[in-house]
């Protein structure tokens, strides 16, 4: 998108021109067609491709399959981080992200949750051969993102550290528009319900779930870490004399289009309880009778949970 007609100002026009030609060639050969369909299904399951149909019945099937990109805000125990690259010069392609969720269930059935977000900018080592104008090379640009953290429902924010202060965030210099701008009613209402907390963290509500938001700027060749600490009252029902088994589960949500994100979820339970069964099996480790940890690349939504028994 660096070389295009600036007067026409359609940097993505090549995609509109190329798509019908590419699809026609891919679907002509039966063998290629099968590989193409397998690739499309894989991309949809990993949220690299989102599908929308005007037919409501068909669209509902896409939602049920997880191919529509709908955010599951109604789920009680969400573990989600949404990242928006704003004036980040396409530098996300060089950034590794690690999400560490540490969930410690207390004897009173509350939970202490710590989320550690680490972003590492590998532009200088990976973008050496990138053929773009030197002044526009994203490998050597700051990675500027606005992140929204969606913790489990009812989470109370205890502390946050490591965020970039709003005054330190690079700002775009935009020209004065020729036409008068009219505030969008939905955006105005969304912003009205937000609260700015100490340090510049923002608390809000979107897509049926509460979130906490912050800026994060990572320079080329460096790492940046943000840590959130929450308390979740009445997080779950522990096994008891009258109900000797219970279940705890959380949905680790993958952001559509995201790549290079790795996640770790650690579940810790109090004395008197043991883990009878845990998921997922792939990437999961039973650290002890009362602790289960999952590690893996976040390629799709992943349910992490355990069946608990009273000892």
Residue ranges and their predicted role:
Residues 1-311:
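Lumenal/extracellular ectodomains and adaptor appendage modules
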